[in-house]
């Protein structure tokens, strides 16, 4: 037999009795079993191919370059609140969306020519009982509360599920819940004139949700007085930092003690909010991260598209094959490139944040300056990439073990 052919012995069970002999296993059964094993083996090999990235040196260089470029954009065009060219753009975008929302809610679909008039209309249209500012109203009972921080301290002003929960609770019970100095504070009978619209529970829930969302829209670009004065105003807290309020509120409701770490993180989040780190600035931070994502996927698709047209004969070309070779979404190669790109982005951004924190602190580390400049969106996206890499590495090891287990071993 030719040496080029791999052979495997097939053993058939043979039974012998007085009348003769018989095979317990037919050749057809053995072949069927072998074919089934081959299918499993091919599927395992295919799984390994789908889990292993096929990046070349240029892929890594281009991915790292994209991350470095977007990191530089983040340093000079995003920076920190109050010194952000991209932040000015996102501020204006939110202001325009606020005016669009006010027009949508107006009975006559009135065009608002200024932000302060739109905010004035929305503040009047979406009244809530938890809008104390600490300026002469019930909010003065909350220590340290003022017009600059009440959007953060007020749980119902948080754009999160817990914020929605406390908004509904406050509207039903005419209360206000705040976080101050690591404590959950509840104000009873917060507004003597308050009455939630709706004739039954479902309609009240709907009205409560609409009030919550509408009131957030009236606050996302600051107050009408700040807009009238030409100031940026205090927006609503970043969804990525309201968790510091959530932890304290949940622990208070469960009767658990609030740790010093919880208080320190909450105070840090409050301090950066007072310096302008709100939803608008968080959106500005997302732009270079999104650009990095877009560039890497585009680079991958263009390189594979060029390779497809240069290596695939015309008679074999098809849209289905081209998409399989070039799609920049589900394959491990582009995911590895994204990990490199976002890792490089975070390295550049964090290096700048650390340097500026040391400079502003006069040699000591200024934590607030560091957090203001650290792109949390980029860190979160990099963490997602690392999670995916870890998951694929575990799956790859498992698939490789299965391949070794199912592969036929040569017999003597």
Predicted feature residues:
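Glycine-rich, hydrophobic membrane-spanning regions of integral membrane proteins that mediate transport
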Residues: 1-407, 411
């Amino acid at each position: 037999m030719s040496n080029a052919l791999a052979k495997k012995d097939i053993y058939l069970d043979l039974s012998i009795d007085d009348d003769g002999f018989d095979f317990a296993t037919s050749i057809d059964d053995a072949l069927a079993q072998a074919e089934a094993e081959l299918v499993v083996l091919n599927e395992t090999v295919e799984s390994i191919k789908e889990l292993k990235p096929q990046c070349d040196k240029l892929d890594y260089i281009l991915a790292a370059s994209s991350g470095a470029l977007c990191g530089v954009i983040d340093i000079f065009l995003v920076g920190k609140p109050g010194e952000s060219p991209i932040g000015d753009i996102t501020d204006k975008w939110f202001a325009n969306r606020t005016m669009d929302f006010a027009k949508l809610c107006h009975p006559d679909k009135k065009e608002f020519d200024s932000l302060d008039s739109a905010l004035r209309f929305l503040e009047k249209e979406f009244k809530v009982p938890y809008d104390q500012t600490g300026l002469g109203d019930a909010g003065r009972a909350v220590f340290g509360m003022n017009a600059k921080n009440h959007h953060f301290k007020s749980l119902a002003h948080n754009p999160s599920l817990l914020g929605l929960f406390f908004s509904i609770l406050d509207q039903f019970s005419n209360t206000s819940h705040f976080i101050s100095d690591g404590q959950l504070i509840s104000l009873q009978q917060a507004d003597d004139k308050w009455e939630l619209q709706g004739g039954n529970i479902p309609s009240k829930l709907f009205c409560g949700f609409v009030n919550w969302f509408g009131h957030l829209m009236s606050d996302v670009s600051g107050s009408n007085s700040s807009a009238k004065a030409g100031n940026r105003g205090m927006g609503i807290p970043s969804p990525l930092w309201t968790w510091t309020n959530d932890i304290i509120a949940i622990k208070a409701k469960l009767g658990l003690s609030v740790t010093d770490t919880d208080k320190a993180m909450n105070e840090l989040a409050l301090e950066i909010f007072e310096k302008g780190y709100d939803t608008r600035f968080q959106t500005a931070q997302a732009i270079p991260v999104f650009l990095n994502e877009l560039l890497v996927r585009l680079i991958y698709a263009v390189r594979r598209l060029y390779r497809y047209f240069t290596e695939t004969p015309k008679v074999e070309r098809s849209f289905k094959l081209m998409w399989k070779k070039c799609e920049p979404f589900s394959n491990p190669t582009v995911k590895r490139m994204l990990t490199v790109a976002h890792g490089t982005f975070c390295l550049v951004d964090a290096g700048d944040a650390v340097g500026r924190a040391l400079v502003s602190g006069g040699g000591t580390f200024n934590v607030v300056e560091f957090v203001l400049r650290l792109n949390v969106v980029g860190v979160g996206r990099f963490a997602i990439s690392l999670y995916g890499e870890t998951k694929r590495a575990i799956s790859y090891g498992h698939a490789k073990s299965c391949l070794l287990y199912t592969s036929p071993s040569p017999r003597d």
